[in-house]
């Protein structure tokens, strides 16, 4: 397996295609949960989870033989530091360690920018993601930044 890592931004059409695939999968996991929420709460959650493509200034795409397999990104937080966003590997490419490769790469990018800590948010139904984050040294933290008070989500941080 020869995996190529491409550094780009959220404006890259390849990044958009991968994020769209991730959003489709994630919506399937959480559609009943979203539907059961009061409208005001759902609107607040939608606003917190929304990511403008322009805000993804550091994106890493994993590909093999010209075929995109996965994606991870960094978004600068308003109060400083970086958040890992949109970690996704297509189902047919899972089980090959690509998420670990992508996470290491975005951590290295953050470290090169002088960061000493990185955070991320995921959902409680994304058990494989939670297991990965714990396995690579992320620890549970409280809500932060745009997610303040959204305690139904799962938050992790890691010292770099």
Give the role of each language-model region.
Residues 3, 7-11, 25, 113-119, ...:
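C-terminal "cap" of GNAT-fold acetyltransferases
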Residues 3-85, 90-91, 103-105, 109, ...:
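Acetyl-CoA-dependent GNAT
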Residues 66-67, 81, 90-104, 108-113, ...:
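Conserved glycine-rich acetyl-CoA-binding loop
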């Amino acid at each position: 397996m020869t995996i190529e890592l491409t550094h780009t931004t959220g404006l890259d059409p390849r990044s958009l295609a991968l994020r769209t695939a991730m959003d489709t999968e994630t919506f399937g996991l959480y559609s009943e949960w979203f539907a059961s929420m009061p409208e005001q709460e759902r609107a607040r959650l939608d606003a917190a989870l929304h990511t403008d493509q322009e805000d993804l200034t550091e994106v890493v795409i994993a590909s093999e033989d010209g075929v995109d397999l996965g994606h991870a990104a960094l978004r600068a937080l308003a109060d400083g530091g970086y958040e890992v966003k949109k970690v996704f590997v297509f189902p047919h490419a899972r089980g090959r360690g690509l998420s670990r490769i992508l996470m290491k790469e975005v951590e290295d990018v953050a470290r090169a920018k002088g960061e000493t800590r990185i955070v991320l948010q995921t959902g409680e139904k994304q058990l494989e993601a939670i297991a990965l984050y714990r396995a690579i040294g992320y620890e549970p933290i409280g809500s932060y930044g745009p997610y303040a008070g959204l305690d139904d989500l799962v938050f992790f941080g890691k010292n770099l």
